[in-house]
């Protein structure tokens, strides 16, 4: 048998070394894969945040503007046609019943529609409650609570600056024929999302003990969460008839 040479020993040793993976190399590869996964997850989360807090606002603003334009066009046609005031029921249209103006929130005019479902609020509007407590529309002239909700973040974020409202600040609701001017009298920065008593005809925790003409604004809190509810209450101080130029009340000038 021929003797094994030194060269053969070296080749065999080299071949055996290539067959084994060093623990350090495996760990490095695992860390690399994990890093790539984390970067991908971060990008996905970033895109989701952009979608939730920016793109949904764009879509909602477009929808709200379109619906608001329809409401104002309908009002203008009614006046030109000489139909005059059609009564409370006629205001409750699919497109919206009127516009909310809250100078402290700097949101301009906010279209108000019937209902507080996500389907309604996601269009960048405020909605009045029909469940679990039914809101009393100011156009009914009945005592009660005109309770409203809107998103705090995303989908138009109409009540994003609700925390800027202070006692004494005006809240104005505009219909085809009337301006309803309310004055903020109480704020509840945080309460359970299940606390429906704040929506009652005589809203609990607002300090009121007798029936009156109230308005309630509700939204999620803290910002970017839906854990609790932020509540603002106002009381009607006067009404003004809408003139031909739709001159706003002094609180909005």
Swiss-Prot record:
Active site annotation, chain numbering: 220
Family annotation (SUPFAM superfamilies): Sortase
Membrane topology term: Single-pass membrane protein
Entry's Gene Ontology BP terms: proteolysis
Domain of life: Bacteria
Subcellular location: Cell membrane
One term under GO cellular component: plasma membrane
Sequence segments annotated as region (Disordered): 1-23, 69-89
A molecular function GO annotation: peptidase activity
Effects seen without this gene: No visible growth phenotype for the single srtE2 deletion, but considerably less ChpC is attached to the cell wall. A double srtE1-srtE2 knockout grown on minimal medium has a more severe delay in aerial hyphae formation than a single srtE1 knockout and does not make spores, on rich medium the double knockout initiates aerial hyphae formation later than wild-type and does not make spores.
Enzyme class: hydrolase
Record field: transmembrane: 30-50
InterPro entries listed in its UniProt record: Sortase, Sortase_Class_E, Sortase_dom-sf, Sortase_E
Signal peptide region: none
Function field: Transpeptidase that anchors surface proteins to the cell wall. Recognizes Leu-Ala-x-Thr-Gly and Leu-Pro-x-Thr-Gly, with a preference for the former. Unlike the S.aureus sortase it cleaves not only the Thr-Gly motif but also the Ala-X bond; an Ala-Glu bond is a better substrate than the Thr-Gly motif in vitro. Among its possible substrates are the chaplins ChpA, ChpB and ChpC; this enzyme is more important for ChpC attachment than is SrtE1. A double knockout mutant of srtE1 and srtE2 shows a developmental defect in aerial hyphae formation more dramatic than that due to chaplin deletion.
Protein name: Sortase SrtE2
Organism: Streptomyces coelicolor (strain ATCC BAA-471 / A3(2) / M145)
């Amino acid at each position: 048998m021929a003797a094994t040479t030194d060269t053969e020993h070296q080749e065999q040793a080299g071949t055996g070394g290539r067959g084994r993976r060093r623990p350090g190399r495996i760990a490095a590869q695992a860390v690399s894969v994990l890093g790539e996964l984390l970067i991908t997850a971060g990008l996905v989360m970033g895109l989701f945040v952009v979608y939730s807090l920016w793109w949904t606002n764009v879509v909602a603003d477009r929808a709200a503007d379109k619906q608001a334009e329809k409401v104002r066009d309908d009002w203008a046609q009614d006046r030109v046609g000489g139909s005059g005031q059609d009564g409370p029921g006629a205001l409750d249209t699919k497109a919206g019943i009127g516009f909310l103006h809250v100078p402290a929130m700097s949101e301009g005019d906010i279209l108000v529609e019937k209902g507080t479902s996500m389907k309604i609020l996601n269009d960048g509007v405020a909605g009045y409650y029909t469940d679990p407590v039914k809101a009393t529309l100011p156009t009914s002239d009945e005592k009660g609570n005109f309770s409203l909700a809107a998103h705090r973040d995303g989908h138009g974020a109409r009540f994003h600056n609700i925390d800027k409202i202070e006692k004494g600040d005006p809240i104005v609701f505009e219909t085809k024929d009337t301006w309803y001017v309310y004055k903020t009298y109480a704020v509840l920065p945080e309460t359970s999302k299940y606390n429906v008593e704040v929506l009652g005809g005589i809203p609990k925790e607002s300090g009121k003990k007798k029936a009156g003409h109230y308005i309630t604004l509700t939204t999620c809190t803290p910002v970017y969460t839906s854990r609790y509810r932020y509540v603002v209450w106002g009381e009607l101080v006067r009404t003004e008839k809408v003139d031909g130029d739709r001159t706003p009340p002094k609180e909005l000038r």
